[in-house]
Amino acid sequence: MPSPRPRRRATALPVVAAAVTLVLAGCSAGPSGTGASGASDALTTFTPAGSGSVDSITWNVFQGEPQTIDPFQSADYTPNMINSNMCETLLAQTPDFRIKPNLATSYSNPDPTTWVYRLRDDVTFWDGSPMTADDVVWSLRHNMTDKSSFYRYLYANVTSIAKTGAGEVTVRLKKPDYLFNDQLASFAGVVVQKKFYERHGNKAGTPDVGVMCTGPYKFGKWKQGQSIGVSRYGGYWNKSLPRRVKNIDFTFLTDDSAITSGLLSGQIDGTYGPPTAGLAQLKASSAGQLYSGAAPLAVTLTVANHKGAMGNADVRKALQMAIDWKGIGGQVYAGEGTPAALQTVPAVYGFAKEDLTSYAGSVRTDGLPKTDEAKKLLAGVPADVKSKQISLVVPQQAETQQLGLGVKAAADEIGLNFELEVVPATGYSNYLYDPATRGDTDLLYTQFWPSIPNPLAWLGDTAVSGGTFNQSGYSGIDELYAQAVGTKDVSARSQLVVRMEQKLHDEMNPMFPGLQLTNEVWLGSRITGAPAAFDYVYYPWAAHLGGTGK
């Protein structure tokens, strides 16, 4: 999902001039890694398996305290990092970016507009009651009809959801849709207890009420401002998950220094997304281990306004190629970011992996600035277009400010009229979602991840009319996208995805290929086993944790 905030909270720089110096010094043709870079190490899917039982651990969620743990309203790092261990989905997305059956043992597509799900008969909620088809139907319908559900838009093509047997649920669509089924591996397919939600209504997910789900860890106590506690559920159905940690306290520290100190001292046993500023200390410490894994994460710029200079394709292309993406990835993101060939990153290639990998290889870039080429491209742009001011808005945080300054330096170098606007991080999401706030802003910073490892999910959110993250209203691939979503043949669908990516790349619209990020996880010396790959937003990652014997 699009996130207005970096996955690592960073302290805003007090003096912008200091950031200018850092960016211009760091963004160079030199090595992209640094001594602190986890990205220089080989990526791994899982950390070494644990062997011992652990009574309790403390795990920090880096974006602070969630507003709710209601899975229907959870679509960001913090709530999902907690909820993924409590509430499960019909299908599951695994740490190697695959989608498989989960609470549904199987699914079938008997005709182009029908999906049938066979349910497990050994699943219970934390109160011991069995999960039934009625619970599944209620949960899917709630996602479809409740206006507060973040995932409601994914049900726009659904006409009915019905129980068609004791352990069977059937979903009927208005038209063929070969993306919908995969979406049930996100909280679009979450299953909660019907009677619990009917009893508590909109209080579900609040500190006093919590949730009632089927996952490996059950809700315990929410101490507002401090922590959320969960405990191992003894009746959990999936015996393949070791679940060697009995109790987990999720804390809400957001200050870089406090998080780093807590990790080094052992007060915090682990975290995803450790502070970039603390990576050097963490990597050099014997208090634990820093691991890196693949991630469907991109840091980039999205075109928000086609009425100004960014409406010209050559201006877009010139600016993108003038930016020192390699330098930004090495310096600003401590080597965790590498230049991306396409708007969609490899971890999301999914069913189109072979075709997209081939195409990405044909347009791969080293990420170094191509200043002379950019200037030549701009030479053919009408003067009145080239002179229009281009505005970029970024949130007031260290990494994003430095990124913005790197972009401005590139724009200045090739003669564009460029303005960088830094706004409070707490209000930045308004620029992403509110047209009135955004106004005539030309470019916006984004860190993006899709709900599932499927390129159609990425493109649907970012490059199709009505997409949550298509602020400019770009419509250039709408017809191809509709055709792809309705195409059953995987090979034909894959080729349509490549055609869309080609068009987006050729037009440099509506997102720039920016940086693809890795995922980092810090595990203190007492624990191991967590996935290193970015899968903690919908997968029960904590069930893999175990003790090291230390």
What are these regions (language model features)?
Residues G50, E419-V422, T426-G427, A457-S525, ...:
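Extracytoplasmic/peripheral linker and loop segments enriched in polar/acidic and small residues
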Residues T58-P110, R141, M212:
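N-terminal lobe/hinge region of extracytoplasmic solute-binding protein
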Residues S108, V116, Y153-E198, K221:
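Surface-exposed binding/hinge segments that line
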Residues S186-S240, N247:
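Gly/Pro-rich hinge or "lid" segments in bacterial periplasmic/extracellular proteins
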Residues G235-Q281:
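Ligand-site clamp/hinge motif
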Residues M310-F351, Q402-L403, K503-P513:
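Periplasmic-binding protein-like
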Residues T338-G380, Q397-Q401:
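Structural transition elements
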Residues V521-K550:
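Long beta-strand-rich cores associated with HINT superfamily self-processing modules
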